[in-house]
Amino acid sequence: MASVTRAVFGELPSGGGTVEKFQLQSDLLRVDIISWGCTITALEVKDRQGRASDVVLGFAELEGYLQKQPYFGAVIGRVANRIAKGTFKVDGKEYHLAINKEPNSLHGGVRGFDKVLWTPRVLSNGVQFSRISPDGEEGYPGELKVWVTYTLDGGELIVNYRAQASQATPVNLTNHSYFNLAGQASPNINDHEVTIEADTYLPVDETLIPTGEVAPVQGTAFDLRKPVELGKHLQDFHLNGFDHNFCLKGSKEKHFCARVHHAASGRVLEVYTTQPGVQFYTGNFLDGTLKGKNGAVYPKHSGFCLETQNWPDAVNQPRFPPVLLRPGEEYDHTTWFKFSVA
C-alpha cells in the first residue's frame, strides 16, 4: 500500500497560484509530483544494497521548472512530439499551431500541458490531476477535458491518461521524465543496458519529422531487441544519440515496451504501455548549463527518456495509428514504470 502526503512546493509569479507537491511512498519507491505540469520532480529507488537514490533529472525548487528547460518530468500535451510545420487538417479544415521548434510545433506548443497548473485530487494510493484545455489553446480545435492519474503499487509507478473532446482533435499524451539509474547526478548513461521491444522504427528527416517510412531495425543501430550497452553501442554505430520513435509490437492492451538495467547498482526499469510507440531519447540536447538537484549539472547523455506515445506527426501521416479523438469517444492510455533490482 502507498501513502500520500501533500505540501506547498512554491508560488507562481504574479499571483498565478500555489503549486503543490504530492509525495507517494511505498516500501520500494518514493515519488514526488507537483501540480505544475503534473511533473515528476523526484523518484527514489533502492539499489541492490538497499540504498535509495533519486533517479530522475530535475530541480529542487519551482523556479527551476519555470525557466527554459527540456520538459524534465512533465506531462506533454495536447500532442507530444512534433507536428510538421505546425499544421494539420481535420475534416477538411486546416489548423495552424505555434511553431516553437523551427519549423515544427513540438510538445503541444509554446504553452503546452507542461506549463500550466493542474487541479489535484488525492487518492488512497496516488494523485489525480485534471484540467480543461480550452477550444483554440495553442491552435488546437475544441475543448479537451484531461485527467492524469499517478498511482503507486509496490515498485511500480502507474500513469493513466484520459481525455474527452468537444470536437475532433489530435491527442497524444506522455510523460517526459529523464532517468539515470546510477542516480540523477551521475554524468552519463553510457553504462546502462537498454532493450526495446520493437521490430521497426520511424526514420526522420533533418527536422526530426518521420519520413513516413516504417523501417525494420534488423541490421541497424536501432535493433535494440537484445540488450546493448548504450555508450559502446553509440560509439560502434557513430551515433550522436537516439531521438526516435520505436514501433512497439503490442496491441492496445498492456504490452512490454522497454527494459533498462544498470549493472553497477543493480537497478532495473521495465516499461509497459498500451501505446503503439515509444520515443527513446538519450538527452542529446542537454548541455550542462542547467543546475539541477544537489548542484548536479546535466551534460549531454546524462539521462534517457522512454516517452510512450502514438507515432509522431500521426495527424499528417494517414498510414500511422489514428490520433484523432472525436466527441463521444474517450482517450484512455496507461504506462507502467516498474522498478526492481537484478
Swiss-Prot record:
Cytoplasm among keywords: yes
Modified residues (N-acetylalanine): A2
Pfam families: Aldose_epim
Catalytic center residues: H176 (proton donor), E307 (proton acceptor)
Compartments, record wording: Cytoplasm
Major localization listed first in the record, in broad terms: cytoplasm
Record GO cellular component, one term: extracellular exosome
Reactions performed catalytically: alpha-D-galactose = beta-D-galactose; alpha-D-glucose = beta-D-glucose
The enzyme's E.C. designation: 5.1.3.3
Alphabetical list of Gene3D superfamilies matching this protein: 2.70.98.10
GO biological process, one term: galactose catabolic process via UDP-galactose, Leloir pathway
Modified residues (Phosphoserine): S14, S124
Effect of G142R: In GALAC4; uncertain significance; decreased protein stability
Pathway: Carbohydrate metabolism; hexose metabolism; Carbohydrate metabolism; galactose metabolism
Acetylation among keywords: yes
Binding-site residues, beta-D-galactose: N81, R82, H107, H176, S177, Y178, D243, Q279, E307
Subunit structure, as described in the record: Monomer.
Function: Mutarotase that catalyzes the interconversion of beta-D-galactose and alpha-D-galactose during galactose metabolism. Beta-D-galactose is metabolized in the liver into glucose 1-phosphate, the primary metabolic fuel, by the action of four enzymes that constitute the Leloir pathway: GALM, GALK1 (galactokinase), GALT (galactose-1-phosphate uridylyltransferase) and GALE (UDP-galactose-4'-epimerase). Involved in the maintenance of the equilibrium between the beta- and alpha-anomers of galactose, therefore ensuring a sufficient supply of the alpha-anomer for GALK1.
Family: Belongs to the aldose epimerase family.
Associated clinical condition: Galactosemia 4: A form of galactosemia, an inborn error of galactose metabolism typically manifesting in the neonatal period, after ingestion of galactose, with jaundice, hepatosplenomegaly, hepatocellular insufficiency, food intolerance, hypoglycemia, renal tubular dysfunction, muscle hypotonia, sepsis and cataract. GALAC4 inheritance is autosomal recessive.
Entry protein name: Galactose mutarotase
Name of the gene: GALM
